[in-house]
């Protein structure tokens, strides 16, 4: 089976490096599926999920805060601010961040940075969705 190398990296560390048969991410204009021999491409990614299907058929879910996706003939590179594997998400901590962001947005005054609260809310929601997908997949 044909594969393409996939690298998911942040400024701090390499999050994933390996061979993939398919990489799915959400671009600004919708969902993208990148398979081997895909045409070169560069696009911005929305906060959301990235799913990497490895050469052995395993599906790896990542929650990302947004970023850039670049496709070259032999490699897909995803540059992100933050990314978390679904299995590494601490649900209680993420729920606390989400609730705090919702509270700040509901009671906003002059001191609340609305953009930052919305960013936190989006990031927490994406992480919780990735965790839920992981749980559903484990049940099957």
UniProtKB/Swiss-Prot annotation:
Chief location bin: membrane
InterPro entries the record matches: ATP_F1_dsu/esu_C_sf, ATP_synth_F1_dsu/esu, ATP_synth_F1_dsu/esu_N, ATP_synth_F1_esu_C, ATPsynth_dsu/esu_N
Cellular location(s): Cell inner membrane
Swiss-Prot/TrEMBL keywords: ATP synthesis, Cell inner membrane, Cell membrane, CF(1), Hydrogen ion transport, Ion transport, Membrane, Transport
Gene3D superfamilies: ATP synthase delta/epsilon subunit, C-terminal domain (1.20.5.440), F0F1 ATP synthase delta/epsilon subunit, N-terminal (2.60.15.10)
Subunit-level organization: F-type ATPases have 2 components, CF(1) - the catalytic core - and CF(0) - the membrane proton channel. CF(1) has five subunits: alpha(3), beta(3), gamma(1), delta(1), epsilon(1). CF(0) has three main subunits: a, b and c.
Superkingdom of origin: Bacteria
UniProt keyword Glycosyltransferase, yes or no: no
PANTHER family reported for this sequence: ATP SYNTHASE DELTA/EPSILON CHAIN (PTHR13822), ATP SYNTHASE EPSILON CHAIN, CHLOROPLASTIC (PTHR13822:SF10)
Membrane-topology annotation of the record: Peripheral membrane protein
Alphabetized SUPFAM superfamilies for the sequence: Epsilon subunit of F1F0-ATP synthase C-terminal domain, Epsilon subunit of F1F0-ATP synthase N-terminal domain
Function: Produces ATP from ADP in the presence of a proton gradient across the membrane.
GO cellular component terms listed in the entry, alphabetical order: plasma membrane; proton-transporting ATP synthase complex
Protein name according to UniProt: ATP synthase epsilon chain
The keyword Magnesium belongs to this UniProt entry's keyword annotation: no
GO molecular function, one term: proton-transporting ATP synthase activity, rotational mechanism
Family affiliation: Belongs to the ATPase epsilon chain family.
